[in-house]
Swiss-Prot record:
This is Pleckstrin homology-like domain family A member 1. Residues 151-283 form the PH domain. Residues 308-344 have a biased composition (Pro residues). The lineage of its organism: Eukaryota, Metazoa, Chordata, Craniata, Vertebrata. Residues 39-67, 190-222, 293-401 are annotated as: Disordered. The gene is PHLDA1. Residues 190-204 have a biased composition (Low complexity). It comes from Homo sapiens (Human).
Amino acid sequence: MRRAPAAERLLELGFPPRCGRQEPPFPLGVTRGWGRWPIQKRREGARPVPFSERSQEDGRGPAARSSGTLWRIRTRLSLCRDPEPPPPLCLLRVSLLCALRAGGRGSRWGEDGARLLLLPPARAAGNGEAEPSGGPSYAGRMLESSGCKALKEGVLEKRSDGLLQLWKKKCCILTEEGLLLIPPKQLQHQQQQQQQQQQQQQQQPGQGPAEPSQPSGPAVASLEPPVKLKELHFSNMKTVDCVERKGKYMYFTVVMAEGKEIDFRCPQDQGWNAEITLQMVQYKNRQAILAVKSTRQKQQHLVQQQPPSQPQPQPQLQPQPQPQPQPQPQPQSQPQPQPQPKPQPQQLHPYPHPHPHPHSHPHSHPHPHPHPHPHQIPHPHPQPHSQPHGHRLLRSTSNSA
């Protein structure tokens, strides 16, 4: 028979698991944080039940507590005194019921009506309260050195890229060019260095001017950049998508140009998603205007460089009058029509043939032979040319007849 987990038996007996095993911190099985910080799980719309009322309803008193202590010894857990009753807001039973609800893991953000609120100890709370005072001073110095202006500063929760996908707080600074993410621990370190520097500066007037070189070490260390500083530049940012409101948080996803998606959440009152979207659109509009101006300037430079190239076509016009003497060979072609009158007398030969025939009748008696002989000698050569004309004339005469 499989033994039930120790945490479940402790819950059945009504004891919070103060020591021993620790459940994984995702999705909603956290019972104790690192450093034994108490974790408060609060269900939306649920009224916190005081610890005294819960013990009365369950009907468990000190007898159950003693049996729980003996059970701890039997289950090989460390024997320890039962602590005092926790504050009324620490409802472990209600929180675990919320964690075991069906569909808790099916939601997109891994939560279903329950929120994890870490309550650090008193010493950590003091440091946490001093974080905002030290953060902007260091961030302002860093931005002034780079020439950027901080438009908004605050704390965002970023989903980690690991297997557990925990929400981690990041000190965020929104500028005109992107979003800076700084871990809070680094700001605490910078704040401690600043406090040491201030203390040394206060001690200097009492000790005298003999130790002016000692504070140089912390001063230089305070100006050192953090080890892990992530910048989400607007040039690599594509859109701000998947805006969802659940409870008091606003969830949104920053989609980068590479296809990477980074999940954030913040209180709804802060409106980080709207500010990031607005600054991203303004940045891209400025870049588009600069691109248009640069193209126009390039075109103007090209137009200014073209006028010196204009005198080049002018010498091309000068060789144009050179082809004018070309018409001079035309008069040489004029003597070509001169041989044309030569064939004219040849063409006249066929024409006189019809004429001598009517006249040959009256003159045929006195001079029948001497005239036809001189004409018959040249006729054999042009006869091929004259035959078509003769036939045409005969046909015309026949038609006229």
